[in-house]
């Protein structure tokens, strides 16, 4: 089907949400069996500092541990509020931040980051002014340290829905911020896949939650393809993506094309699709790409394609550049778990 479709369903009792654009899988949300998932807000207890790593460990509920980088003014035993920012690798602590974000469908409340802001994606000045006035009224009486961001989906939403949403998320933020003292505790759980789809994927041309929706829209077939390392590209080229404990290895092959431009064409196709593949597979950390052979003078073309592709991706990424052996190195934040076994 053409257009933007959100598909909701279950696989072996696990919630699944898929975002399709013109039939192609663009984003995915799956049940995660981890103790805590990115976005969860907790009360923790400051543990020992680790000078060599530039941070402190934080005791979390259920005997779990988190790691907070560059803390300021914290003492061991102190209770603090933290938010999970990524996935904990096996045997490692959860990455944490003290910069909390309270997200809802229309608004984001930002403690200690004051100001009322409207998404830059909304360009109509009259709409921006109306939304600013609405936000100002909804935040009347709030602590001056609370900021607010109105999300792009507000452009087409009814004012009363936006106002109710702001008041609800503001109330949640105010209640949590008062609940600092005490033992480690989960205060706000991250949304499940279906709720996350409603909150973060905006409006769609269709939302299908019928029993056969995953099969009907081809989601199951596309998930099966993700369970293997090979990604088929245009012109018979391919990209192999394999995760090791240290990094994600990506190998790009030209296939049957033997023309002089084959290497560059295959590498450009791989660069364009790489952010989507990493996102759907739940892969992050260091990524090392062995592009198909092409002249050094064409490397700047690949860099431009990579930068454009990752700018459009929601995950944070940094481009380290070319290694002495001619591979390209980048890093992507681990913002979700790798595909679980029940997906295949």
Regions found by a protein language model. Give the residues of each.
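A short, flexible beta-alpha/helix-coil linker loop
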Residues: 64-65, 114-116, 155-156, 254-257, ...
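Extended, charged alpha/beta regions that create polyanion-binding interfaces
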Residues: 1-35, 40, 89, 97-143, ...
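Conserved glycine-centered short motifs in functionally critical loops
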Residues: 54-58, 88-90, 94-109, 169, ...
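S1/OB-fold single-stranded RNA-binding interface
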Residues: 4-21, 27-31, 35-87, 93
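Short, well-ordered alpha-helical scaffold segments within catalytic/effector domains
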Residues: 43, 132, 220, 268-275
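Structured core elements
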Residues: 7, 16-19, 43-45, 57-59, ...
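Short loop/turn segments at strand-loop or loop-helix junctions that form parts
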Residues: 74-78, 111, 151-154, 250-254, ...
């Amino acid at each position: 089907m053409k257009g933007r479709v959100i598909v909701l369903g279950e696989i072996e009792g696990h919630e699944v949400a898929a975002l399709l654009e013109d039939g192609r899988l663009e984003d995915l949300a799956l049940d995660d069996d981890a103790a805590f998932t990115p976005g969860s807000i907790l009360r923790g207890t400051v543990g020992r500092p680790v000078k060599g790593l530039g941070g402190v460990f934080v005791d979390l509920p259920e005997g779990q541990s988190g790691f907070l980088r560059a803390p300021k003014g914290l003492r061991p035993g102190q209770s603090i509020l933290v938010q999970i920012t990524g996935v904990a690798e096996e045997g490692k602590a959860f990455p944490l931040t003290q910069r909390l974000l309270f997200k809802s469908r229309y608004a984001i409340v930002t403690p200690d980051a004051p100001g009322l802001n409207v998404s830059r994606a909304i360009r109509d000045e009259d709409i921006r002014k109306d939304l600013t006035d609405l936000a100002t009224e909804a935040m009347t009486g709030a602590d001056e340290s609370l900021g607010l961001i109105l999300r792009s989906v507000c452009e087409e939403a009814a004012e009363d829905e936006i106002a109710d949403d702001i008041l609800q998320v503001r109330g949640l933020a105010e209640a949590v911020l008062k609940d600092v003292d005490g033992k480690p505790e989960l205060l706000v759980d991250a949304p499940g896949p279906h709720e996350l789809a409603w909150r973060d994927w905006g409006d769609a041309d269709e939302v299908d939650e019928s029993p056969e929706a995953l099969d009907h829209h081809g989601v199951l077939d596309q998930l099966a393809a993700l369970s293997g390392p090979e990604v088929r590209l245009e012109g018979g080229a391919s990209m192999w993506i394999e995760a090791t404990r240290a990094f994600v290895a990506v190998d790009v092959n030209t296939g049957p094309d033997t023309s002089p431009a084959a290497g560059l064409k295959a590498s450009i196709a791989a660069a364009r699709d790489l952010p989507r593949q990493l996102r759907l597979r739940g892969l992050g950390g260091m990524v090392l790409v062995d592009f198909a052979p092409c002249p050094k003078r064409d490397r700047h073309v690949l860099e431009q394609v990579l930068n454009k592709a990752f700018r459009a991706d929601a995950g944070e990424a940094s481009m380290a550049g070319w290694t002495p052996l001619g591979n390209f190195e980048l890093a992507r934040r681990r913002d979700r778990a790798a595909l679980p076994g029940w997906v295949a």
